[in-house]
Design a protein with these regions (language model features):
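Arg/Lys-rich, alpha-helical DNA-contact motif
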Residues: 1-32, 51-52, 64-113
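Major-groove DNA-recognition helix of helix-turn-helix-type DNA-binding domains
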Residues: 36-58, 81
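Minor-groove-contacting beta-hairpin "wing" of winged helix-turn-helix DNA-binding domains
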Residues: 58-64
Length: 113
């Protein structure tokens, strides 16, 4: 059976950068989504591995990219990496992901014109 081709509309839905960038989730939900305990998320926040959206607020809320960082760091820890090594590897990958987000966003802006 031949796999179904993904049409342009499906790709736009999957790559809705504007939506992904606007997603902001409280620490409890991040813990529920990722399976990583809040205490561990707070520790990673204190170490600078992830950053809340508003550093001045007493409420810890995170955007999509930071939620993704939590998932990736935990996966690397599960594979046996140290926290520092996992954070370094994720930050390198995060830089690449951020560049892709910028390019996709720029392409979407260009298409609107």
């Amino acid at each position: 059976m031949k796999p179904k081709e993904i049409d342009k509309a499906d790709i736009e839905i999957l790559m809705d950068v504007d939506f992904l960038v606007s997603v902001i989730v409280a620490i409890g939900e991040v813990a529920n989504i990722t399976g990583v305990p809040q205490r561990k998320i707070r520790y990673w926040d204190e170490k600078g591995i992830i950053e809340p959206v508003d550093k001045t607020s007493t409420y810890r809320q995170y955007n999509y990219l930071n939620i993704k960082k939590v998932v990736l760091v935990q996966e690397l820890l599960d594979e046996g990496f140290t926290l520092d090594a996992a954070a370094k590897k994720v930050n390198e990958r995060y830089t690449k992901v951020a560049e892709v987000f910028k390019r996709v966003s720029a392409l979407k802006d260009h298409q609107k014109k």
